[in-house]
Each structure stands twice: as C-alpha cells, then as structure tokens.
C-alpha cells in the first residue's frame, strides 16, 4: 500500500502551525503574523506589499488581511509610495522590534523541541528530499 505522502505532509504542516499558534498566543500573535513580521524584518527596508507577498509565497489579498491585523496592533505602518500611488511601503514600528525578538525565541525553542531526536544528517537529508519534491512539483506546474 502506498503512503499518502501529500496527506501526511499536509497534516504535519497543520499540527506544526497549531503548535506555533498556541505558543505565540501569550504574545497575541499567530504563526501567520510571525511569518509576515519575520519577512518584513529580514527583507531590505521599505518593501512593497507585492514584494512581501512574493517573498512569503502567498497571494496579495491574503497578505492584506494579515497586514491589517498587524497595523491594528501597532506593529507595522504602511505608506503610499510616492512614485506609484497604488503601491504601499511597509515598515516595522518601534513597538515591533522587541516583540520580534520574543517571537524568534518562541519559534527557535519550538523548532528545537520538534527536531529533538533527529540527527543533523537526518535533517539534512529531509531538507534535500523536500527540495527535490518542490523542484518536481514546480517542473510539473510549468509543463501544465
């Protein structure tokens, strides 16, 4: 009997995300908030919403909802771009900086606990296998 690999991977992502959401709850944030803030923090300053959506790998309407929530919490600001009034530039606020450090600590601790008992070699092999799967899927999508 073949393994339902797609279902297994989807379930893994779902329970991993639920654990991160649970652990970020005391900070009143979610895994989606973390991914967005982390990417804003890592990317060069004044990224547009379009650039950020591409970096995260999501559609812009999904990102806008998350950015609305983060702006409501006072963690980001959005300014209209002078050269293109349709584009908005995203900046972290001063309030976000210490929170990002707290979030990183939660994420790093959780990741270490999840990977407990998995050797560096096993992890490296898993990363390579995931990259191969992703490559194959992208090639299949390109073929149509």
UniProtKB/Swiss-Prot annotation:
NCBIfam families: PRK03573.1. The lineage of its organism: Bacteria, Pseudomonadati, Pseudomonadota, Gammaproteobacteria, Enterobacterales. Residues 2-135 form the HTH marR-type domain. It comes from the Bacteria. GO terms for molecular function: DNA binding; DNA-binding transcription factor activity. SUPFAM superfamilies: Winged helix' DNA-binding domain (SSF46785). This is Transcriptional regulator SlyA. SMART domains: HTH_MARR. Transcription regulator that can specifically activate or repress expression of target genes. Belongs to the SlyA family. GO terms for biological process: response to stress. InterPro entries: HTH_MarR-typ, MarR/SlyA-like, Tscrpt_reg_MarR-type_CS, Tscrpt_reg_SlyA, WH-like_DNA-bd_sf, WH_DNA-bd_sf. Gene3D superfamilies: Winged helix-like DNA-binding domain superfamily/Winged helix DNA-binding domain (1.10.10.10). Keywords: Activator, DNA-binding, Repressor, Transcription, Transcription regulation. Residues 49-72 bind DNA. The keyword Ribonucleoprotein does not apply. Homodimer.
């Amino acid at each position: 009997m073949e393994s339902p690999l797609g279902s297994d991977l989807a379930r893994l992502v779902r329970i991993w995300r639920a654990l991160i959401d649970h652990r970020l709850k005391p900070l009143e944030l979610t895994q989606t908030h973390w991914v967005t803030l982390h990417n804003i923090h890592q990317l060069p300053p004044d990224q547009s919403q379009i650039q950020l959506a591409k970096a995260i790998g999501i559609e812009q309407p999904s990102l806008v909802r998350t950015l609305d929530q983060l702006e409501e919490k006072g963690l980001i600001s959005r300014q209209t771009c002078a050269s293109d009034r349709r584009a908005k530039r995203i900046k972290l606020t001063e309030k976000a900086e210490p929170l990002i450090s707290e979030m990183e600590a939660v994420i790093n601790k959780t990741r270490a606990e999840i990977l407990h008992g998995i050797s560096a070699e096993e992890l490296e092999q898993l990363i390579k296998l995931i990259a191969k799967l992703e490559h194959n899927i992208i090639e299949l999508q390109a073929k149509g």
